Amino acid sequence: AESKPAESEHELAEVEEENELADLEDAVWLEHLADLSDLEEARGFFGNTWKKIKGKADKIMLKKAVKLMVKKEGISKEEAQAKVDAMSKKQIRLYLLKYYGKKSSSKSVRKIVISKSF
């Protein structure tokens, strides 16, 4: 996986800000990206445009994984980048979905507890 350090943090922050992605939305969004990237018909139909979209989606997932790993594991950006580079695309998706799945489910539980207490 290739990364451009100059744009990684900045570009990811812009995407998150533009789309106002909350944790639950991140999980759903990343899951949709993973599903879309596997659709053979879509790749054939959209051709080069699809490749560009998929490439951008893959870069965003890589950057998100690096950022999350730095935050979660307390390691340097370079160490996190090396770990992510060694992972397959499937492993990266699973890593992100596992994190956001746990985070969104804990938020859901809190919402249920709060709503039942009133």
UniProtKB/Swiss-Prot annotation:
Residues 1-3 form the signal peptide. It is found in: Secreted. Residues 4-43 form a propeptide. Keywords: Antibiotic, Antimicrobial, Cytolysis, Hemolysis, Secreted, Signal, Toxin. GO terms for cellular component: extracellular region. Expressed by the venom gland. One of its GO terms (molecular function) is toxin activity. GO terms for biological process: defense response to bacterium; killing of cells of another organism. Pfam families: Latarcin (PF10279). The keyword Transmembrane does not apply. Insecticidal, cytolytic and antimicrobial peptide. Forms voltage-dependent, ion-permeable channels in membranes. At high concentration causes cell membrane lysis. Belongs to the cationic peptide 06 (cytoinsectotoxin) family. This is M-zodatoxin-Lt8p. It comes from Lachesana tarabaevi (Spider).
